[in-house]
């Protein structure tokens, strides 16, 4: 899938995802159920991957 965003849109989306990431870390820390924590950690890894790719794309866009 291709999605074209302006730099400002990328910054907004990254900020929203970073906030969710911080919330997710807190949620993981307060979760006692092993399987649920495992699921949250999987979501955290996916979110980190998305943020990383979003940032890379933003840097490439600035260089262009």
Task: Tell me the role of every PLM-derived stretch.
Residues 1, 63-64:
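Terminal, compositionally biased segments
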Residues 1-27:
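N-terminal acidic leader/helix
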């Amino acid at each position: 899938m291709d999605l074209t965003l302006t730099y400002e849109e990328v910054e907004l989306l990254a900020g929203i995802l970073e906030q969710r990431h911080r919330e997710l870390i807190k949620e993981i820390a307060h979760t006692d159920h092993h399987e649920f924590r495992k699921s949250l950690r999987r979501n955290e890894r996916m979110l980190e991957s998305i943020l990383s790719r979003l940032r890379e794309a933003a840097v490439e866009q600035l260089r262009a």
